[in-house]
């Protein structure tokens, strides 16, 4: 166990005693804190790299656009924490660098973003085996996924370049995670 795991265990044990949690609740709290710690670590690495590469704002815009839709649309996940790091760096560092330096055609990006909104309309929300969506929430999540992706697309019609392309990139990345090609691999 590393330092952070020890601190998480200590804090989870403290919360268990203080709030009279049973063992299952303790494990849920501990897992939640472990996931949070890993995600914060990934964000620090990703945004530090973005800052060093002078693309912080573009990474932030792409990531926020992605997350706003993903919160309701869900979608495929990396198979492990290691692959999550690799995918995060590829999607939110490498792709924004490519968009920035290769000046991707605006019409092409607009078309891909519009197509991606169509993917969100067709496939959101996309549950996974490990992260199922309760039936009572599917309709609401679908509605918000469509509304948010549509609003983001409309915003791109009014925002200046290059920011437009990074909002569009976030929409495109999230739409790709919704495609059914990822779900046969999970079963």
UniProtKB/Swiss-Prot annotation:
Topology class, membrane: Multi-pass membrane protein
Name this polypeptide is given: Accessory gene regulator protein B
UniProt record similarity statement: Belongs to the AgrB family.
GO biological-process terms attached to the record: proteolysis; quorum sensing
InterPro entries attached to this UniProt entry: AgrB (IPR006741)
SMART domains recorded: AgrB
GO cellular component: plasma membrane
Stretches that traverse the bilayer: 49-69, 82-102, 107-127, 143-163, 164-184
Domain of life: Bacteria
Subcellular location: Cell membrane
Keyword match Hydrolase: yes
GO molecular-function terms, A-Z: peptidase activity
Enzyme Commission number(s): 3.4.-.-
Role this protein plays: Essential for the production of a quorum sensing system signal molecule, the autoinducing peptide (AIP). This quorum sensing system is responsible for the regulation of the expression of virulence factor genes. Involved in the proteolytic processing of AgrD, the precursor of AIP.
Phylogenetic placement of the source organism: Bacteria, Bacillati, Bacillota, Bacilli, Bacillales
Keywords, comma-separated and alphabetical: Cell membrane, Hydrolase, Membrane, Protease, Quorum sensing, Transmembrane, Transmembrane helix, Virulence
